[in-house]
């Protein structure tokens, strides 16, 4: 009887293969149909400091200025200066100043959003992604998506249940 040695690389390859096969077999690629060709995608930012400002806010603002059908409607950060900087930048470039929040739950409750960009510290990614998917929002989240395997499974389940588009950025 031969014994197989388990190692991290083998575990990851096997797990990734099983996850991919499950996704293909169960048809979990369920991108929602947009509201219509004239509807703008309403986007909120959670954590528009550092990477959230440079990669998310600036890039999305540029896309809006170039004519993409998006509206940058809200920014949220517990550090007010990050939210203020993002809101001022968006207003300077687009003429519209997004609403500012300190609490992302309040932003999700008050704003009529279609999607969020998450650029908060890593330990918040899973919680915020699950919350946003549960509210029917499309999600772009900076890497890492999660800190643990259990969190990754929870995010996967939330995504499968939501039928929304989710992407994890790797710069």
Please state what every model-predicted region is.
Residues 136-146:
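ADP-ribose/adenylate-binding Rossmann-like module
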Residues 2-137, 150-165:
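N-terminal glycine-/serine-/threonine-rich beta1-alpha1-beta2 phosphate-ribose binding loop
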